[in-house]
Amino acid sequence: MTGAAKILFILVTSMTLAGNANTEPLEYIGKPVRGIPVSSAVKVGKSVFVSGMPAFDSNGKLAIGDFPTQMKQVMDNLTGVLKAAGTDWNRVVKTNVLLTRTSDFAEMNRIYGSYFVEGKYPARTTSFVAGLPHPDFLLEIECEAILD
């Protein structure tokens, strides 16, 4: 291949690859909470990426209480963000669950499972962590969903 042919090949290849670059616009869902620089979710194409949700209620106050209280608040928060993004739990494909206590694992599974159709659960990672950003957080969950 001559030098000119190599240059032409490189130009054509790079132009083709550049044309395939993902240029989908990003849509940011939700306002930053309590001055933290994070969106509740980001939509791109047919995907929705939901930030980790703690147990804040609609007034921005932590749902103080036992684990079931916090777990239900987190799941309700995620439900609201998914709805705002145009999707729901039936379209969630992946979740990441962070728990601060191993003793909450069974209760987490019980409540978590109630949000899905039996046998149609998303992929999930559950991790036990030493702590979360607020000392009273018992858990945090993030998820990824797709749009119709």
How should each PLM-predicted stretch be described?
Residues 1-3:
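N-terminal secretory signal peptides that target proteins for export/translocation
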Residues 5-76, 80-93, 99-148:
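N-terminal presequence-like segments and the immediate start of the first folded domain
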